[in-house]
Amino acid sequence: KHHIASDIGCHLFSIMPPFELGATTMGYGLGPASASAFNSPDAKRRSISFVGDGGFWHNGLTSSIGNAVFNRNDGVIVVVDNFYSAATGGQDILSSRADNRSKSTRHPITEAIKGMGVTWVRHIERTYDVGQMRAALKEALTTEEKGPKVIVASSECMLNRQRREAPLKKQAAAEGRRMVKTKFGVDEDVCTGDHA
């Protein structure tokens, strides 16, 4: 098994059933830092750690990415990039893709990571493409390249997307324009009852 570590954030829910993925949790931006002890040269498997984009900018760039480079850690770091600091309410951050009149946004996480000295960086633009995510993780876990392997996994936070689109849909409906409302449900022929 791989040691899996997270910081606090929505991705931390993976430690709960039915997935139960995770061994350690540390503060905002510190998932990769908490995995550093498991990245020794004699480790049989690479650790996997998660940090959200809010935590990445808050503390993770220096405490997690910078230290992984400095200590030549050989683990896999996944930056969950949902375009906002979703864990604290959806505020814009440096890498937010929204136009913000009073803040500077649209600074790519990948560029900051490369600027810290990470050479193995992959960016998945649509994390709902499970095959692409799986392939990136497999490559990160099996590559011969030493040093930290960082995957930036980008997809917009669905809560913030709903908040962003709701007023636009309301206005369009008020103007008499036709609107499509996406609905989700459970396919009882496929569902295993695991609440995933």
Language model segments and positions:
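A structural signal for short, well-ordered beta-strand segments and their strand-loop junctions
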Residues: 4-5, 150-152
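Thiamine diphosphate
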Residues: 15-150, 158-164
